[in-house]
A protein has these predicted regions:
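Extracytoplasmic/secreted envelope proteins and their assembly/folding machinery
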Residues: 52-59, 63, 85-88, 106-109, ...
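Short helix-loop capping/hinge motifs at secondary-structure junctions, enriched
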Residues: 147-155, 180, 193-202, 290-299
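Bilobed "Venus flytrap"/periplasmic-binding protein-like clamshell domains
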Residues: 52-56, 179-197, 202-206, 210
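Hydrophobic membrane-insertion alpha-helices, especially the h-region
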Residues: 14-30
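Extracellular/periplasmic juxtamembrane helices and adjacent flexible linkers that interface
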Residues: 2-17, 38, 289-373
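N-terminal segment of the mature folded domain
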Residues: 6-16, 34-180
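Periplasmic-binding protein-like
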Residues: 124-130, 134-142, 211-224, 228, ...
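Ligand-binding pocket segment of bilobal, Venus flytrap-like solute-binding proteins
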Residues: 193-272
Length: 373
């Protein structure tokens, strides 16, 4: 008994000693990891999905540039493509907390500011509109098949409306759900402007409630076969399914470049509405939110400065985007009607966002009254 007891005691002491050493080593290692994690500056960028290819390229190039210039400052960036409306709702619901928010269009910025103020009762706006960085844009266009347009000579919204009234023409149209996606939202604004004959920036609530306008829109929407969540999906659907399934879609110009020459059933072309078009100007906004630290803002500002570099902008042009800076020339091999179905010059009016925020808030309600069942 005594012998056995004497043997167990040093084992117990050794065990406790080893446990203590293990704890100290493990705790030190954990602290080292935590210190390393605290030393890394992490930002999150939420952006509209149609610019994913460009953003992926820009992200890779920026990380390389940052590491070369700041070898002792570690950063990490999470990149998340979202629908513009979806991301706005996610911010308001605190589901996402981006450092940089880049919806497809500036049309969403006053939206978020208004809803943020109502939700938080905070006098400070979450977006400083004057500080939004705009680098590229893409107009909303009417996508159709070249052969289809050779027959029907579509020039804009009014022509499409007339075709919808002709029972002998089988129009199969699509745009995205304006409650979820920027392109559908902007398309409904453009259609209302055409219906009322009112410049889009001057649209009022009277234009939305006008029975004649509502009738026109109902006729216009009558040929819709789907309302997608993603503009990119509509482009891919048009490309893969051909003109028998979808012969009219409202897309971004840059997506026409992606699908024009490789689509089943012929060539897809962009029609630039004679009434004018809204531009998706892809603003980049560093949010004024409590989750954005000064260190994160510093990295975010560096990223936006990098995006503004001419070489970075020129990369975006290869994906079919146009530069905000007029001194940066277009590539005629990209903006080439014969090759990619898109024009080099834009010879149509640029429409503006409605000045009345209430109009913006009610556009989706108007669509719900008018949409095809």
């Amino acid at each position: 008994m005594n012998k056995s007891h004497k043997i167990k005691k040093p084992i117990k002491v050794k065990f406790v000693f080893c446990l203590l050493i293990g704890f100290l080593i493990g705790n030190s290692f954990t602290n080292l990891l935590l210190q390393d994690d605290r030393g890394e500056i992490h930002i999150t960028i939420v952006y509209s999905s149609e610019k994913a290819s460009w953003m992926t390229t820009a992200y890779t190039d920026f990380i390389d540039t940052w590491n070369d210039a700041h070898p002792d400052e570690k950063i990490s960036i999470d990149m998340h493509p979202y629908g513009s409306s979806d991301s706005m709702i996610g911010i308001l619901n605190e589901e996402i907390s981006p450092t940089i928010w880049s919806p497809a269009s500036s049309i969403w910025l006053p939206f978020l500011n208004t809803k943020w103020k109502d939700l938080t009762n905070n006098a400070e706006l979450i977006i400083n509109l004057s500080a939004a960085v705009k680098i590229i844009y893409s107009p909303i266009v009417i996508a159709t098949w070249e052969a289809f347009n050779d027959t029907h000579n579509i020039k804009g919204f009014s022509d499409l409306h007339k075709l919808n009234l002709d029972s002998g023409i089988n129009i199969k149209m699509a745009h995205t759900d304006p409650r979820l996606s920027n392109s559908g939202f902007m398309s409904v604004i453009m259609a209302l402007s055409a219906a009322s004959g009112t410049p889009s920036e001057n649209l009022t609530m009277n234009d939305l409630t006008d029975k004649t306008n509502q009738k026109w829109l109902k006729e216009f929407e009558s040929s819709a076969i789907m309302y997608g969540k993603s503009t990119g999906f509509l482009a891919r659907y048009m490309k893969s399914e051909g003109p028998d399934k979808l012969n009219i879609a409202f897309l971004y110009e840059n997506l026409i470049r992606d699908i024009s020459s490789s689509s089943n059933g012929g060539k897809v072309i962009a029609i630039y509405p004679e009434e004018g078009t809204l531009y998706s100007d892809h603003p980049f906004c560093i949010l004024n939110a409590d989750w954005v630290s000064p260190e994160q803002r510093k990295v975010a500002e560096a990223f936006l400065d990098f995006l503004k570099e001419p070489t970075t902008v020129e990369t975006a042009l290869q994906y079919g985007f146009r530069p905000i800076d007029p001194s940066i020339p277009l590539d005629p091999e990209v903006f080439n009607y014969e090759k990619n179905g898109i024009a080099y010059n834009l010879n149509i009016p640029e429409l503006k966002t409605p000045n009345d925020v209430n109009v913006l808030l009610k556009i989706s309600d108007l669509w719900l009254l008018s949409k095809a069942s």
